[in-house]
Amino acid sequence: MTDLSDVSRTAAAKPPAVPGRGPANKVRFVTAASLFDGHDASINIMRRILQSQGCEVIHLGHNRSVQEVVTAALQEDVQGIAISSYQGGHVEYFKYMIDLLREHGGEHIQVFGGGGGVIVPDEIRELQAYGVARIYSPEDGQRMGLAGMITDMAQRCDIDLTRYAPTTLDTVVAGDRRALAQLITALENGKADPELVSALHAQAKAAAVPVLGITGTGGAGKSSLTDELIRRFRLDQDDALSIAVISIDPSRRKSGGALLGDRIRMNAINHPNIFMRSLATREAGSEISQALPDVIAACKAARFDLVIVETSGIGQGDAAIVPHVDLSLYVMTPEFGAASQLEKIDMLDFADFVAINKFDRKGAQDAWRDVAKQVQRNREQWHSRAEDMPVYGTQASRFNDDGVTMLYQGLVGALGARGMSLKPGTLPNLEGRISTGQNVIVPPARSRYLAELADTVRAYHRRVVAQSKLARERQQLRAAHDMLQGAGHESAALETLASERDVSLGAVERKLLAMWPQMQQAYSGDEYVVKIRDKEIRTGLISTTLSGTKIRKVVLPRFEDEGEILKWLMRENVPGSFPYTAGVFAFKREGEDPTRMFAGEGDAFRTNRRFKLVSEGMEAKRLSTAFDSVTLYGEDPHERPDIYGKVGNSGVSIATLEDMKVLYDGFDLTNPSTSVSMTINGPAPTILAMFMNTAIDQQIDRFRADNGRDPTADEEAKIRAWVLQNVRGTVQADILKEDQGQNTCIFSTEFSLKVMGDIQEYFVHHQVRNFYSVSISGYHIAEAGANPISQLAFTLANGFTYVEAYLARGMHIDDFAPNLSFFFSNGMDPEYSVLGRVARRIWAVTMRDKYGANDRSQKLKYHIQTSGRSLHAQEIDFNDIRTTLQALIAIYDNCNSLHTNAYDEAITTPTAESVRRALAIQLIINREWGVAKCENPNQGSFLIEELTDLVEEAVLQEFERIAERGGVLGAMETGYQRGKIQEESLYYEQLKHDGTLPIIGVNTFRNPNGDPTPQTLELARSSEDEKQSQLHRLTEFHGAHQADAEAMLARLRQAVIDNRNVFAVLMDAVRVCSLGQITHALFEVGGQYRRNM
């Protein structure tokens, strides 16, 4: 446990502040998750608490390199850096950060970190000895609480940075950006020498540097647009310009804290020529900081070629930026209400340029026309056409948007007229004012698809109620008729009433009731017999206990009321029958447990050995592959410390096709009993192409071995086709979930969704029927903090979004729906007991009744992984108990495959011993646990049935909330899903911390002797030899294919530009290009992911 008496290591630290009082100085923090780490839920909570305690926070989000964090910290001149690191490589990461800070004049900046149980006590001591101010452990969290840890950080950083500011302008004028940052701090704090400020303005006046002001309403996309303009300045001028960006965000009146959130959106500023500084408005009561004139002067004195000022969001009557800039750009969206509202917008009087951003929204064309006419009226330029006004329609979220380029070229002309030195640009000149691109992932006419699906499910249940009532009444009337007739009384009227109900019963419902006696007979014997053509397939239905009791594989209800029978058949039914509530297959596959054999550590050789170990003795090889974080983010291994430390940690390092061949060596990837699951998303298309080529090359090698020669071109084509039709497995590749919760997006969302569609089209064209093109995942949404209902609702909503997107591309529902699979988390909450039941029923009903899909498409197949969030670093031996309970409910709910987490995953990559224990949990349930011999044990439980209905209705209501926001993509744009996940995560953490939610061994039933386990655990880390081997193999691969790689990358880029099938080209590209080479080539034409707050 960390020693709390270990106070700040810097001489500048102040005595602890009075508890409950904000910092005496303006404390600024940079917060981020470490490189190749998408776990940003905790750091988001931390930065919110920092803000509430009066700190100004520059939040960088997930996946940030040491260089990015240090550059931000130096330019923003902060007192502290807070980093969460859950993905391994933390020792190298934090040490590299301390080294860079010391090298670049930031030695007084204090570094704080945390990573749950991933950073073990010995490593905490090592890092703190090296210079990290504090690494917070899980024990610290329990003892201090979230707010206590943040207070500790703020107190340690409560120092006045003015002491470090330059006393002359010499270093600033000479181009020292660190000195500029420190001068800005003094100016912002109002503590700069007045004579120095006067000299500063004199220097600025002589510099004649143009200033571009960008302002607009909150949420208009100013930061994204600013970043896209900077990207075009860099491209067009070949990085010859030096640009300063001053970004202003509002301070919170109550706490004085501020979220300085523009930097997180910037992808184009990572260059030595770009300087960015975030300012809080503080006490200004305006959209600009009181220090802005001085800060602009400082940037001019520093001899930048251009200064860009971006203000915080403004109202209709605000135009405070205008006096401070030479050129102003007003950014708005099409949703401004009636055209008369435009007359109230002050900036339309003053702005030199207007951008209507988010131009893909409904009514954008009309908005552009109305704004252009208003600008024309304001300027009284009746001699010009309204469409010639400097009003542009832009889509900053769309990579390489031509509307943004048109705006950029208009700005360049105006800046040149104001004296800015520019060379002829390299970007082609574009004519026009508005973006011609339209994002049609889901057509606008289908934006309410989720609400329609909710209506479909509810309509189905209304029909169930009505039809079961008719069936009950028909049976009752017939019985009454028979009794009256038997007693010699008149019964014709009853016969008429019964006939009316018979006619009102639907054909499907009559068929279900007619087949009920046959179903009872089929399941009543010792075997279930199905005839397919002339062949009988027999399945044993009886297991006999040691006591001689016969346990049936499927147990039917004993209802005699036809209304209840029909209701059960329509809402439940036996496994394998619509609506598949109890399962999509009639029986589990004999001899194949749903066990996934999980591995991923070190290099491909070590993980291959682990696969062979965990699958030993198993007839079915169900290999589940975890990749290291370098691979997850599409990069190659590298010796740079923040990359090097993560190579082969928390997963296997795969950079080339040769690595992939080693990984699955010895496993026949086309064998029906072999399937491979690959947990990867951002670079999934490239990894999938490597896997498919590995499977193909296995069979070509087999042909050579069997025939003693190479196959002919025709034979090779047949082998390729056969392999694609027979290979079994799953790739996760779920980009929507990544954007909402997991954060391994690397490309722009639009481009990633386009390539997902390319993969599915390729699968359809090549008849890839046994491999899932996507695993639509709720697991990582749950791991990010979502409760079970949100997990299920968001996951199903994402699945239906893919359905709508693929239908919009012209694919038929039955050609692609069978390639979709799902992946859920289990946990300790009661709702987890029915996740599969609810998911299967909603999917089946909507697929049949809304989309007209066939039986195969109606079957939702899903994988379950026990909850990683429920694994705790304290009393880790208790984790297996939680995992066992979660595995039990997954098996009871008929999941199609199951992965049980190892008990030590809260701290390290699973060891051989812990993986064996995790596998044993499943084996014991499947082979020893008596009730598991029955394959529908949940059916008939009053609690399970009620939970199913409650959870289903909660999911449908969430569908409607998402539909109100324009569907999944519209909700993502406003951060709806991410915000809800974070709220639910914080709620869980609060209940865990205050003990309201009891967690055994964590906040109650604590070991009185402490918890020594983390000290003695074997930590799974990649070895130095494995890392060096990966670097060496990568160098060899690059050398062997040097002659072909660049031409192939050019072909790949051109495929994107021409809007051709990218995956088809990737199938060739992976043979000569590494993962990192492909990723960076696609960045150039597909765009990088833009992080959200």
UniProtKB/Swiss-Prot annotation:
Substrate binds at F587, R622, R728, Y772, S821, R856, K861. GTP binds at G219, A220, G221, K222, S223, S224, R265, N357, K358, F359, D360, E973, N1092. Adenosylcob(III)alamin binds at H39. Mg(2+) 1 binds at S223, D262, E310. Residues 169-417 are annotated as: GTPase chaperone MeaI. InterPro entries: Acid_CoA_mut_C, Cbl-dep_enz_cat, Cobalamin-bd, Cobalamin-bd_sf, GTPase/Isobutyryl-CoA_mutase, IcmF, IcmF/GTPase_domain, MeMalonylCoA_mutase_a/b_cat. Pfam families: B12-binding (PF02310), MeaB (PF03308), MM_CoA_mutase (PF01642). PROSITE patterns: B12_BINDING. It comes from the Bacteria. Residues 26-156 form the B12-binding domain. It catalyses: 2-methylpropanoyl-CoA = butanoyl-CoA; 3-methylbutanoyl-CoA = 2,2-dimethylpropanoyl-CoA; GTP + H2O = GDP + phosphate + H(+). Its cofactor is adenosylcob(III)alamin; Mg(2+). One of its GO terms (molecular function) is GTPase activity. Residues 418-579 are annotated as: Linker. Homodimer. This is Fused isobutyryl-CoA mutase. The lineage of its organism: Bacteria, Pseudomonadati, Pseudomonadota, Betaproteobacteria, Burkholderiales.
